[in-house]
A protein has these predicted regions:
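Sec-dependent N-terminal signal peptides of Gram-negative exported proteins
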Residues: 1-9, 15-24
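Intrinsically disordered, low-complexity N-terminal regions enriched in serine/proline/glycine
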Residues: 5, 50, 84-86
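Residue-identity detector for glutamine
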Residues: 7, 37, 48, 52, ...
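Short linear sequence elements within intrinsically disordered, low-complexity coil regions
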Residues: 11, 52, 56, 90-92
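Short, surface-exposed beta-edge/turn micro-motifs
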Residues: 13-16, 33, 48, 82
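N-terminal secretory signal peptides
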Residues: 21-69, 74
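Mature, soluble, non-transmembrane domains
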Residues: 73-134
């Protein structure tokens, strides 16, 4: 497997690292936060989630969806701002995130951190697993 590594240092906090494991290899990103974005396969509407990398796992801090439709009803307490429904999901920290990669949807996943975005799961392959790097 190939290893692609992006490092960044900061005086304000010690960065943690996430690893995205796919059939293509391992993408390692040193970061304390990231955004996942994808397009809903039926409604063709963008969806975004903001995640924090913490010792307890991945914490979903905010989500946004640009509209509503089949299976995309805004959550209770969602606020419509600039064409996006913003809300804070109430889920416990996750030890890993598993992203489907069918290659049959409108787009793959976009993982953004540290001002750079990476396309994942644009072709049919095994699910992509995002974990904290050891």
């Amino acid at each position: 497997m190939a290893l692609v590594e992006y490092q960044r240092t900061t005086d304000e906090s010690r960065l943690m690292a996430l690893c995205a494991l796919s059939a293509a290899g391992v993408l390692r990103i040193a970061t304390t936060s990231f955004m996942l974005q994808w397009t809903h396969s039926v409604e063709k509407i963008p969806w975004q989630e903001d995640w924090q990398v913490t010792p307890a796992g991945f914490v979903l801090t905010q989500a946004r969806v640009q509209g509503s439709g089949a299976g995309m009803e805004p959550s209770e307490g969602a606020v419509l701002r600039d064409g996006w429904y913003h809300y804070v999901p109430k889920i416990p920290p996750r030890q890993e995130l598993v992203l489907a990669a069918s290659g049959e949807t409108v787009s793959g996943w976009k993982l953004c951190a540290n001002g750079q975005c990476h396309e994942l799961g644009t072709t049919a392959e095994q699910p992509i697993k995002i974990t904290q790097c050891q």
